[in-house]
Every structure is written in C-alpha cells, then in structure tokens.
Amino acid sequence: MTLTASSSSRAVTNSPVVVALDYHNCDDALSFVDKIDPRDCRLKVGKEMFTLFGPQFVRELQQRGFDIFLDLKFHDIPNTAAHAVAAAADLGVWMVNVHASGGARMMTAAREALVPFGKDAPLLIAVTVLTSMEASDLADLGVTLSPADYAERLAALTQKCDLDGVVCSAQEAVRFKQVFGQEFKLVTPGIRPQGSEAGDQRRIMTPEQALAAGVDYMVIGRPVTQSVDPAQTLKAINASLQRSA
C-alpha cells in the first residue's frame, strides 16, 4: 500500500458540490480547473477522462488542491473489484464507486480492501440505478420493479455490506434518508440549477431541491463547466445552498 497523494495538500471544502469533468482534451480540462477554487467544490473524473489521461491526470487535480471522486463504477468478480478499489485508494482519491448490482460478495470484498488504509480510505459508494434509466429500460433487462423500488433494493444491499452510501436520483433521497439513516451518504447526479437544460439526465432536481431532499453530495456538470464564469457560478450555487440550509 502506497499513498501517492497527501490529504494535507488539499483544500478543505464543506461544499456538497462535485463538478463532473467531461473533456476530450486534458489541457482544456486543466484550463477550466484553474479557473475555480477547490474550496468551492470537489471534482469527478469518469471513465472517459481516466481512460484518456490516466492516474497522472488525477494527480494533477490533487496537486491543485481538489478532492477527487473517481467515478469508474467497478463491476467485476470480487477479487478484481477489490484490487481496483485498493488501487483507487493508493491514488489518494476522496471517493470511489462500484455497481451495487455486482452483488454482496463483490461489495464486501471492495470494502475489506480498504481496511488497511484506515482513516485515509476513500468513501466507498455503490451505484444503484443510473439516472438515465426509466421503467421501460429496466423492463428490457427483465426487472419488473420501478426505478425507485429497484434502487431501494440495491441500496439496502449496499448498507448491509457496510458501504458508505449510494449514488441515487434526487427523487429517492427523501425515502432513502428515512429508511437508511442520516449517516448513509447519498450522491446524486442530474443536479442542474434553475434554467439549465436537462441534457441526457432523466430524473433531475435543482441544487436547492436536492439539499432539501437530503442529498449529501450533488454532481453538477455542464451548468458549471460550460459557464462563461464557472467560478462565479459555483459561488452562486454554494450561496443559494447556504441560504436554503
């Protein structure tokens, strides 16, 4: 086990905002990142950017003071998923995720892989139902439950495996906080400030609505990354959340 990123080098943020980086060019991504303050948000790196630019890109972001949510949604046999999660912890990320549909043995193995990291371990979150999926999409897979019911079933399995929380839609947050408790973290994509286009997300909410629903960390992408003044956009979102708190 080798920790490659020191948490002491990062800025401390109390903001629930996680900005999704979706760039095809590393320089463009870093140019955007250099316009914003790590005290105002964390950053999410997904499959495309990690595949294109690798661990070094994550280190570049960490060196700028940002906490990183490594959104790779591991879904594999238990041993492979566990090694992947441990590799993410070695990289020093703040949060990493797996697919809850990988099952209890996979999630348990992933959690156990983080034990040696102690307090430096990242948050381990499970994905329930992708926010782009509707009931008809689940039916195509042979799942007869509604997206909300299926997500709750997967969330219950996640908590049973002692993970830190789940990725879920904002619409499920109120129910999940009631069922799973305040300590079970809810990470929600599809969050868009008032007036933003829905894009490819189907189940969306504004940041204020998400906060009221019990969302702990809200993922926001294009409304920030495509903003003329992303730093000001972030400050406005955080200010609105503080007023709503």
UniProtKB/Swiss-Prot annotation:
Substrate binds at residues 22, 44, 71-80, 131, 192, 201, 221-222. It comes from Shigella flexneri. It is an enzyme of class 4 (lyase). Belongs to the OMP decarboxylase family. Type 1 subfamily. The gene is pyrF. Gene3D superfamilies: Aldolase class I (3.20.20.70). SMART domains: OMPdecase. Keywords: Decarboxylase, Lyase, Pyrimidine biosynthesis. The active site is at K73. Catalyzes the decarboxylation of orotidine 5'-monophosphate (OMP) to uridine 5'-monophosphate (UMP). Coiled coil: none annotated. Homodimer. One of its GO terms (biological process) is 'de novo' pyrimidine nucleobase biosynthetic process. Disulfide bonds: none annotated. GO terms for molecular function: orotidine-5'-phosphate decarboxylase activity. Pathway: Pyrimidine metabolism; UMP biosynthesis via de novo pathway; UMP from orotate: step 2/2. One of its GO terms (cellular component) is cytosol. Its EC number is 4.1.1.23. It catalyses: orotidine 5'-phosphate + H(+) = UMP + CO2. PROSITE patterns: OMPDECASE. The keyword Iron does not apply. This is Orotidine 5'-phosphate decarboxylase. Pfam families: OMPdecase.
